[in-house]
Amino acid sequence: MVGQRVRTRFAPSPTGYLHVGGLRTALYNYLFAKKMHGDFIIRIEDTDQTRKVEGAQQNLIKALEWAGIVADESPEKGGNYGPYVQSERLDLYGRYCQQLLDDQHAYYCFATHEELEENRQLQIKQGLQPKYNRKWLPEEMGGSMPPSVIRKKLDEGGPYVIRMKVPDYVSVWFEDIIRGPVEFDSATIDDQVLMKSDGFPTYHFASVIDDHLMEFTHIIRGEEWLSSMPKHLLLYEFFGWEPPKVAHLPLLLNADRSKLSKRQGDVAVEDYIRKGYSNDAIINFVAMLGWNEGEGSEQEVYSMEQLIEKFSLERVGKAGAVFNIDKLNWLEKQYIKNRPTEQLVPVIKPILLAELERKETMMPVDLITSEAYLEKVIELMRERVGFEHEFVTFSSYFFFEPDSYDEEAVKKRWAPDTNSLLQEFTEILATLEEFSAENIEAHLKEFVAPKGLKAAALIHPLRIVSSGVSFGPSLYHMLEVLGKETVLRRILKGREKITFSA
């Protein structure tokens, strides 16, 4: 394996959505492969046909590609090591399983579900770790089952599985890139089923066969697979193969340090896409769930290119990583604040066009969908929104008439003379040839000064009638962006709808 091109893989089961933990596993495999100028491969592990969900494979790959994780080889792309779907590789597993049978590293087992459960319950009652009791281990392999009985069962054609025979009294040791040396006693390892009664291999068997045949150099996966390693290493030993290097990632935890689960929040990548999170923020956030650049670095916002450059498995911790949604929200805001305006326009425009399909506007559609107009809205609102879609939804008054006015703000800001002041000031605004923020501000101050009023007497009512709300960006810049025609129309409508009430 020395000098071999680095090859990593993400091998999901098509059983539903892409979990954020799965996204992290895929990301770390991708980052490591790209940093090492190697290849990242997607393999679909669908050996458990009972859990297979129609369309899940396509959705998994679509979610990965949304995140910017594009495979060099996959079921869709193909490659030199296919097929990349395990259910299309069944003949391979059968041949290798027969080799283990011939070499007496595996045996037929005809135990029924009832027998297995009875044995399990008995061992639990005795305080023992549940394991198969080897009733069907043949005499020639150190068991008690006569070969004639096994042959008779095979001739009868009844259901059976094929189990690996775990050697007695051996220690299984390996070096984990993240955790260091790890050791298991073979006494704790069950005689794992390799081939099920339906002719499909188990995860453990198919995974080892494929990882070897596809020439993966590194296996990077979640901590939950750590206990499977001794079974996998024994299979490598049985076949005389060199195992790949391994790294087991820390668990993802809720804020209370319980294992991340749907009961305490969203765990599907699709949920975060639906809520409007950007792929940049999600990838940045997920990358830091277990990894950090190290002492001396204060950087928290990374592009994919920077992550590839700086990532290393040696900087991944062993302790569980807490999924902090506040951190994700903070990152989302950082990306919005720092992303060039010209990159945000093509993201926001489709959101606006979708809204225009649902709602009518009194503003010129050509104007409000133009790049120049959207750029002005972005510059005014980028410090105030948390998601890209909020440039349209949270800032809807830049595109649609207010359908209501903030009642509390009206109670607080409306005086007996507010409507008459608005009427007078409307006449001044109508005469402005240059409808700019500076010009509007100057004329407003000139208007209120002789009356002994503060600018706030008009600023707040103007904001309410123009936007429907009591908060937002600079009023004068907001009015400039809206334009004279829209502002005059909204002031008139506001005066008609809002009256002073003591």
Swiss-Prot record:
The gene is gltX. InterPro entries: aa-tRNA-synth_I_cd-bd (IPR045462), aa-tRNA-synth_I_codon-bd_sub2 (IPR020751), aa-tRNA-synth_I_CS (IPR001412), aa_tRNA-synth_I_cd-bd_sf (IPR008925), Glu-tRNA-ligase_bac/mito (IPR004527), Glu/Gln-tRNA-synth (IPR000924), Glu/Gln-tRNA-synth_Ib_cat-dom (IPR020058), GluQ/Sye (IPR049940). Catalyzes the attachment of glutamate to tRNA(Glu) in a two-step reaction: glutamate is first activated by ATP to form Glu-AMP and then transferred to the acceptor end of tRNA(Glu). It catalyses: tRNA(Glu) + L-glutamate + ATP = L-glutamyl-tRNA(Glu) + AMP + diphosphate. It comes from the Bacteria. A motif ('HIGH' region) lies at residues 12-22. Pfam families: Anticodon_2, tRNA-synt_1c. GO terms for biological process: glutamyl-tRNA aminoacylation. NCBIfam families: gltX_bact (TIGR00464). It comes from Pelodictyon phaeoclathratiforme (strain DSM 5477 / BU-1). GO terms for cellular component: cytoplasm. Its EC number is 6.1.1.17. This is Glutamate--tRNA ligase. ATP binds at K262. Its main location: cytoplasm. The keyword ATP-binding applies. The keyword Nucleotide-binding applies.
